[in-house]
């Protein structure tokens, strides 16, 4: 916050800049997504670590806080019973599912889940479930009760284990009955009232399975939201609303660590905006359950740039920002993935204010909306390489964004006016943009101006 305030004090020196578009995409006429998707913020809830109790009943008490924070979509990590065979740690991986139609007793009962879901809907949230279609636990009833062809099996007839996931058994999507049953699982939860799915390791399943699912589920509810844990234009062709921005996450980490530059970020933006359809949405994040537990917290990976890159995920084109459990209070801790490791306290602090401000910006600034609704990115020329400077504008909504993505102070001397009266999104202060004077940016400083 302090970096932004010092920057705002110098805004009178900012001059207008020549604008250049980052890429060309096909225009879209009809809305591709449910209306509530475009300006939404996703919150990934780790029920086990959300509260000391680690239950739906306790998590329900957290919903008013999240409502005030301004998130819109609650993504629940897997909520189903966890297998015991090959279990990792004491409590096991959420992703080693024993029964898709039941609730993990660690979290409570089906009635507890339904109360949580109803309360979330009363408060205006959408709730999506983690849908793990690639595999079950090795002791799921299907392994012995269903025909052998339901699973991919090795040379001695045992279910195949992928990677170091010895606590799972891979399902066989060449088997039509598996496809049918997994689509029935989706329908079961849609009928319970959930609003969509985050689809685990989506690239492991055939593309046509997702297309079939999309068609059948949206015949029941056309506003269902599908998020792919995968990255590539093919996921949008398959019917997904959004996929992961893994490459962006890597570039941000590398810039913060001095391994890449703003030029690499611009290259990623160019590739995305030319290779993906205009309506494509990418989930943008500085943390999630995988990054936090296996790669480190955003503070470990991004250091002094943690807030800067978090803010960037809110303003890049076609993006949908994600907040992971604990980020809203700046919790700098790697969660134990297979054990109980709850957040010790939820006192609101500067990070709460930071994310609340960004969420409000997201809701009220059409230029920043996702997919085809938001404004295209137009670069400001005449700036040093270390500074990412651009505008986005649509239907009278405009943002001007400047990010010093380096650990050194930077200066900009623009040449062509793009002057006007703006409001600083993070402070609410008014800013007059004038032409012809030098602008100084502190290390990792950023500013988001709206009009």
Where are these regions (language model features)?
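Bacterial N-terminal signal peptides that target proteins for export
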Residues: 1-9
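C-terminal motif of bacterial Sec signal peptides marking the signal peptidase cleavage site
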Residues: 19-21
């Amino acid at each position: 916050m302090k970096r932004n305030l010092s920057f705002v004090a110098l805004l009178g020196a900012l001059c207008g800049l020549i604008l250049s578009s980052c890429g060309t995409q096909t225009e879209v006429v009809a809305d591709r997504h449910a209306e509530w998707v475009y300006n939404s913020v996703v919150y990934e809830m780790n029920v086990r670590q959300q509260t000391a109790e680690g239950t739906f009943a306790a998590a329900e008490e957290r919903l008013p806080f999240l409502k005030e924070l301004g998130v819109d979509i609650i993504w629940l990590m897997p909520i189903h019973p966890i297998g015991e065979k090959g279990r990792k740690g004491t409590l096991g991986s959420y992703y080693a599912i024993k029964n898709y139609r039941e609730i993990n007793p660690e979290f409570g009962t089906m009635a507890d889940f339904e109360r949580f879901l109803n309360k979330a809907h009363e408060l205006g949230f959408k709730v999506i479930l983690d849908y793990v279609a690639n595999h079950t636990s090795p002791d799921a009833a299907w392994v012995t009760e269903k025909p052998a062809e339901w699973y991919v099996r090795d040379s001695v007839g045992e279910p195949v284990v992928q990677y170091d996931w010895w606590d799972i058994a891979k399902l066989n999507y060449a088997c039509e009955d598996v496809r049918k049953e997994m689509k029935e699982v989706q329908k079961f939860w849609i009928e319970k009232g959930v609003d969509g799915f985050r689809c685990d390791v989506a690239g492991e399943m055939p593309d046509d399975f997702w297309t079939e699912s999309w068609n059948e589920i949206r015949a029941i509810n056309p506003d269902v939201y599908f998020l792919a844990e995968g990255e590539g234009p093919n996921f949008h062709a398959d019917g997904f609303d959004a996929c992961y921005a893994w490459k962006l996450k890597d570039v941000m980490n590398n810039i913060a660590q001095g391994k890449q530059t703003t030029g690499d970020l611009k290259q990623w933006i160019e590739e995305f905006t030319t290779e993906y359809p205009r309506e494509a949405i990418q989930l943008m994040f500085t943390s999630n359950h995988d990054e936090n537990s296996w790669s480190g917290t955003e503070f470990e990976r991004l250091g002094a740039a943690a807030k800067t890159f978090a803010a960037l995920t809110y303003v890049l084109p076609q993006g949908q920002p994600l907040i992971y459990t604990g980020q809203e209070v700046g919790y700098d801790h790697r969660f134990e993935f297979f054990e109980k490791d709850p957040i010790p306290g939820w006192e609101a602090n500067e990070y709460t204010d930071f994310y609340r401000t960004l969420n409000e910006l997201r809701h009220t600034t059409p230029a920043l909306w996702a997919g085809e609704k938001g404004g295209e990115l137009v670069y400001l020329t005449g700036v040093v390489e270390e500074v990412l400077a651009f505008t986005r504008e649509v239907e009278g909504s405009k943002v001007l964004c400047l990010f010093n993505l380096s650990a050194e102070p930077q200066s900009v001397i623009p040449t062509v006016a793009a002057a006007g009266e703006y409001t600083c999104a993070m402070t609410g202060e008014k800013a007059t943009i004038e032409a012809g004077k030098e602008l100084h940016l502190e290390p990792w400083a950023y500013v988001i101006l709206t009009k």
